[in-house]
Amino acid sequence: MGCKIELPDGSIKEYDHPVTAADVAADLSPALAKRAIGVEVNGELWDLTRELPEECKINLILEKDPRAPEFFRHTFSHILAQAVMRIYGSDKVKLGIGPVIENGFYYDFDLGDIRLTEEDLPKIEEEMEKIIKEDLKLERFELPKEEAIKLMKDQNQPYKVELIEDLESDVATFYRQGEFVDLCRGPHMPSTGKVKYFKLLSVSGAYWRGDERNKMLQRIYGTAFAKKSELEAYLKMMEEAKKRDHRKIGPQLGLFSFSYEYAPGMPIYHPKGTIVLNELMKFSREVHSKHGYQEVMTPQIMNDVLWHRSGHWDHYRDNMYFTEKDEQQYAIKPMNCPGHILIYKSRAMSYRDLPLKLFEFGKVHRYERSGVLHGLLRVRGFIQDDAHIFCTREQLKEQLKDVIRFVDMIYTPFGFEYRADLCTRPEDFMGDVEIWDLATEALKDAIESIGLEYKVNEGDGAFYGPKIDFHVTDSIGREWQCATIQLDFMMPERFELTYVGPDNKEYRPVMIHRAIYGSLDRFFGILIEHYAGAFPTWLAPVQVVAIPISDKHVDYAREVADALAAEGVRVDVDEKQKSTNYKIREAQLNKIPYMLILGDKEKESETITVRLRTGKNIYGMKLAEFSAKLKEEISNRMSESIFKFKAD
């Protein structure tokens, strides 16, 4: 049996015998063969050592390829599992799953009565290093389903048996390295000696298959990179991220709390946190107004007839909350779009009324398993800055470009860099392929006309249309998915939305779903970590604290505070019977942007000493000058202090 192989440049290589991608790489260049770690075969990622089909297109995966981590991190997950089995005994260790995740990998274990802690990680790492030095080959093999089940039963691996029984295929794929065998689709590195730089990070609990009705397993997380410098940089970033964890900083600053006993996954915002949310909404409302949007409010609960018609009942029901009254079933809204559609349908629409741009700070509820809840970043109830644009097909491209410009206006004051993903048709899509292709092309044209960097995520669109996801990069280099622009030709069809064109005929509008913050709660959590709690002045819950040096300066401090409050500044007076240094320290811990130190000299000269939270001072400033500049900083939503400070 021969092989006919097409290379990325379109050239063809033919062989009269079976070959692997490693063979092809060696034929092309010995240097290339050394750099290759995997291969893409007809769009799928394969091991280098897997025999190629008779006809195929291949693209070798090199170390710098963004897909490269899929190979070495997956191999690390198997090395981790093998190490755990060697240490704790193959008779005691029951294997769950061990996938690649963003920036790393994990493996789930059932260890019976053995309880892992982070103190166990060094000895597991040591055993992993031994396995790497052994340079064990990873050998892929397939078994018929029944033989695969028998193999896993013989090895006393009940979780693997369950996975095989659920396979739709009649064949199961395994990988062997030394004495270790695991159910796995791959891909992997050729041998354990081909991986180097890793670190085990943490141990946590995880329900089998993410279902809290199942047994709690023990999950070990790890990370791995192609270069030592990349691993070191990531670990440094992770250390910084721990310091910035919004789940610690938020309660410390009195921003929010959670009651997992009474309202799991539902944030409780305290006065200071509510101030920040209101400032974010105020900013958003200003930009919406400039772009021609109209704010609306729609019902929190609507009956099941609406959700059947919208398609959410069939495609999203498992994530919804329900109630029943008067023999009528209702759902708490997981999305705002049906309510906005009802506004569109409330009157006859003409082409002159379009585009109609409706937006809402809508509270939505979506069920999330308890195991995935994560502070403000993964909740069950949250606020969306949700908007829907109803327009003609002729208006579509310009409206999409306007939304992209809107994204830039919102993200710029926070200092975020961002990029876009174009997400295409998923397997469970609604509607016609032709309409999907038209919608996808419209999104692509809009992105390219703006000149925005983007990549394509095949199959990652929503069930009712393709979308653009925006990813922001925070101050320590992490990416967060926030804004979404979603095209929808399906919902107008389902709700029979129409408008009368210039020829007096009825036409179907196009619908654009759009959120910029995304989840306001999640965006808040991201900002806490982005700023490490030290919000710019316009967002800070308390913008200024007046600090009287002693009791005799309290009246002057109140006078200064009242003057600033009259100008709209959020200001407190610290009247505690504590030392000035104590008060300054407390203000710094509370991340208050400005401290006004007020003593005899300031009172007599009717001036103030301005201290920034970083410790820099300006002496003898007139209150009127400070107030004017502060208002300018706040109104322009500046990310840095407007004042020029000198270090003491």
From Swiss-Prot:
What domain of life? Bacteria
The residues listed in the UniProt record as binding Zn(2+), with positions renumbered to this chain, are: 337, 388, 513
Q: Name one GO biological process term.
A: threonyl-tRNA aminoacylation
GO molecular-function annotation terms?
ATP binding; metal ion binding; threonine-tRNA ligase activity; tRNA binding
Every TGS domain range: 1-62
Family according to the record: Belongs to the class-II aminoacyl-tRNA synthetase family.
- Can you name this protein? Threonine--tRNA ligase
What organism is recorded for this protein?
Kosmotoga olearia (strain ATCC BAA-1733 / DSM 21960 / TBF 19.5.1)
